[in-house]
Amino acid sequence: AAKVMLDAADRRGKILDDVARLAAAHGLVPVHDEGLLHEVAGLVEWPVVLLGRIDDAFMTLPPEVLTTTMRHHQKYFSLKDKSGKLAPVFAVVSNMETKDKGAAIVAGNERVLRARLSDARFFWDQDRKRSLAGRVDALKARLFHAKLGSDYDRVQRLRALASELSRYIPNADPVAAERAAELCKADLTTGM
């Protein structure tokens, strides 16, 4: 028999409480994410919170890569240890109670996360092969605006502007300002 919790506020409360309770049982705390909480509460009718594990091999990725992959692609809640370090555990919200207490659901979500994080690792490793400075010329191939030119053209305008503006800021370094402007759009050429 299907179960439904009609009130979205009740679903949010249950998700919040259950994530916190399960995290605390492992000495962890959830990463506060009101937007994700609202989104997930709108996706499920009967929230059942389960915990899954992140393979240790992926814990060397930057925390931002892990949390972005979990949050945006999978709708998982990140957990941290008491020191604030990202834990190799995530919370997933299922839409049903199962006879195996969610074991198959957790296993499936861990498998999907492994695939997502493998992709993320590939792009991260590829991106690290070239410095941001080595990517600036690739901005020439990216159109910023038909009337304003490429992203490279845009960066050149930003460099000139940064240098000029730095003159009006006490102790500002115009060379550093130009360098920051030169690199500020280079990430647009990365896989991440």
Regions found by a protein language model. Give the residues of each.
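Amphipathic alpha-helical "coupling" segments that flank catalytic cores
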Residues: A1-M192
